[in-house]
Amino acid sequence: MSINRNLLNIIIILCICLNLGCNDGAQERETDSHTIQVSSLLPSSSSSCVLSPRASTTKSSLHVTHRHGTCSRLNNGKATSPDHVEILRLDQARVNSIHSKLSKKLATDHVSESKSTDLPAKDGSTLGSGNYIVTVGLGTPKNDLSLIFDTGSDLTWTQCQPCVRTCYDQKEPIFNPSKSTSYYNVSCSSAACGSLSSATGNAGSCSASNCIYGIQYGDQSFSVGFLAKEKFTLTNSDVFDGVYFGCGENNQGLFTGVAGLLGLGRDKLSFPSQTATAYNKIFSYCLPSSASYTGHLTFGSAGISRSVKFTPISTITDGTSFYGLNIVAITVGGQKLPIPSTVFSTPGALIDSGTVITRLPPKAYAALRSSFKAKMSKYPTTSGVSILDTCFDLSGFKTVTIPKVAFSFSGGAVVELGSKGIFYVFKISQVCLAFAGNSDDSNAAIFGNVQQQTLEVVYDGAGGRVGFAPNGCS
């Protein structure tokens, strides 16, 4: 009888093993990693553009295109080859500028009050590589213009005729305010002109009683011109009269191709603040993982996924353009990294649409790099590039198994990164971990746009929170 009972126990155990898996290590490797085709890491060679269904069907939604992709109006259906080293250089310039602005180390000298073309003082505003673009209608009649959208900037601006000193090369016709019946300049005695200090870091000045703005970016790009009000058209049903924007008559720098910038920051002159009665300071986006696909930028709460998990906006960025986050943990391959809570809580963190590579405090990055390399030990390493020091040569492999990486934020939001949110690919023989360490423990962490790809990212300015959900572009 005991033999039969023992046999029965063995059978039960075998059944459990077959159904649930008795090899914990094997199960952990399967569920805590991505196995993908190496070729899928490369940019698509397709010359066609796949439109995001979200942007095509959701109210108040715009298509988001990659600056170098086939979907961009700027490229006439042909992808352009980005200079990755230059992108990373500009990215570091942006990060340096963000950190300087947060630590209040940059000078905030005023724009000279003599001429509208005077170069403003360096103010700590941020540009970077400006990877993602939307098309917005400006004026009456409407002029469709391609603008970089940026959660780290407040003032929306575009190049305007006449170019008093210089304008950079722009693919679309430069906006001519004299041909718009809805354009008018703003007085230098207005409250909006007085708000320029907080929106741009430079006080407004006067030219024949008209308000002059000036903004200079961390890479020495700049725009100077008239603060004005104009009609903005997002969609046929989303039209706003009297939106404050900068009409730049002296513009220079690395904006080449685009008309200007759409400011999505937190200041009262930002686009979300100016349209708050319509959208309640809510907008969301999904950044496409491929340059041959579009994502979306949607204003208001329409179409936001019920699966979005929110985290409170932290106080670290109060008084700035930025949206702060509280990172509480990072996991690699299902294992929580041994990072003391003070590593993140002391400098704080923020999310930024314009920073490419996620930056972490030195101790946090060291823990991430060490764990990731250990789990990728079967793949040969190769030399790093610029700010990226952990790279792999995958040229001898058809598939690659990548440990999953997830970020946990206060409030219970957990963001698991897709495979394209983990790597920055130069070529198959040089596939790099898309994270970098800050130069100092006091510098804030920045959740960059490589890690945001394909996520639905929701900014609820009125509710003081940021949310995340997977599969945001579909």
Swiss-Prot record:
EC number, UniProt record: 3.4.23.-
Domain Peptidase A1 span(s) in chain numbering: 132-469
EC supergroup of this enzyme: hydrolase
Protein origin, superkingdom: Eukaryota
Inducing stimuli: Up-regulated in AED1 mutants.
Biological processes annotated in GO: proteolysis
UniProt keyword terms in alphabetical order: Aspartyl protease, Cell membrane, Disulfide bond, Glycoprotein, GPI-anchor, Hydrolase, Lipoprotein, Membrane, Protease, Signal
GO CC terms: plasma membrane; side of membrane
Bilayer topology term: Lipid-anchor; GPI-anchor
Subcellular location: Cell membrane
Described function: Probably not redundant with AED1 and not involved in restriction of salicylic acid (SA) or systemic acquired resistance (SAR) signaling.
Name under which the protein is recorded: Aspartyl protease family protein At5g10770
Source organism of this protein record: Arabidopsis thaliana
